């Protein structure tokens, strides 16, 4: 199983996916711990941080073991999460001139989501291209 992870780590697509996951994790954790988005109790902070870590770890672990045709769906799910949540919660505040604290990292979080959506499209096109490519003689 780890051989698949090592093999995928050589591809730029997996590296981009991992970097975007790290950006998303860092923003979500910063929102949780610094800006207290999930409440002020220690239990709420620890719980939210563990869920953030779990969200990133599941994506990083699943990507290499999924079939090439299914990977775009995983990447699109993470990208849509980042793009939509980041846009609604942070980018609108930046555009309105009301940005504070986590809105700046939230904008980077949104850009990571946009990168993942573009990566999902690229992976889907590659999967379709491989599917329709004629067999070599």
Language-model features: locations:
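Juxtamembrane helix-break-helix junctions at the cytosolic face
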Residues: 3, 57-73
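Cytosolic juxtamembrane helix and N-cap/initiation of the first transmembrane helix
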Residues: 1-21
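Hydrophobic transmembrane helix segments
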Residues: 15-46
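Membrane-helix boundary connector in multi-pass membrane proteins
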Residues: 68, 72-73, 85-106
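Membrane-water interface at the C-terminal end of transmembrane alpha helices
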Residues: 9-15, 113-137
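Non-cytosolic membrane-interface motifs at loop->transmembrane helix junctions
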Residues: 37-48, 97-111
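Aromatic-anchored segments of alpha-helical transmembrane domains
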Residues: 20-29, 79-91
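Hydrophobic alpha-helical transmembrane segments
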Residues: 50-59, 63, 116-117
């Amino acid at each position: 199983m780890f051989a698949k992870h090592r093999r995928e780590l050589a591809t730029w697509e997996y590296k981009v996916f991992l970097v975007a996951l790290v950006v998303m994790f860092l923003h979500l954790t910063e929102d949780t711990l610094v800006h207290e988005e999930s409440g002020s109790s220690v239990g709420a902070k620890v719980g939210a941080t563990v869920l953030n870590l779990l969200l990133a770890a599941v994506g990083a672990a699943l990507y290499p073991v999924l079939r090439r045709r299914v990977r775009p769906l995983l990447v699109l799910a993470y990208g849509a999460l980042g793009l939509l949540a980041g846009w609604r919660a942070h980018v609108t505040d930046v555009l309105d001139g009301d940005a504070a604290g986590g809105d700046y990292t939230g904008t980077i979080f949104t850009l990571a989501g946009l990168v993942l959506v573009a990566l999902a499209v690229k992976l889907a096109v590659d999967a379709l291209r491989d599917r329709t490519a004629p067999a070599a003689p």
